[in-house]
Amino acid sequence: MHHSRLCALLIDCNTLNVDEAAQFWAEVLGRGVDPKHPGTRGNYRMLETPPDEPIVEIQRVEHESRVHLDIEADDIAAEVARLTKLGAKVVDRLERWVVMEAPTGQRF
C-alpha cells in the first residue's frame, strides 16, 4: 500500500502584500518567516517549521481567504483512487498535484 500524510497547511490570503500577511501569521503562530526556504518565492512565503511538523505556507490568492490542507503521497494515482472511494471528487489536475474536494465541500 502507498503512503500518504499531511504535508502542509496553506493559509490563502486575498491580499496585495503577501509579506505583510506572512509576518502576521508568523507572529500569530510564534514562528519566523523563512526567506531561504526554496518555497519562498512569488506568491508564497514559508514559515519556519520543525522538520517533524507539516509545513505552514502563506499563499497570496485572488479568491476569498481560507485555509487548506495539502496531503503528500508517494503514489498520487493510488491516493486519488483511495480518496475518490471515500467520497472525494477531483476538481482539477495540475502539473504535480490534484485538487480534490471532500463530500462536505473543503478543497485539499
What is the predicted function of each stretch?
Residues C7, N43-R45, V98:
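Extracytoplasmic/periplasmic beta-strand context in beta-sandwich domains
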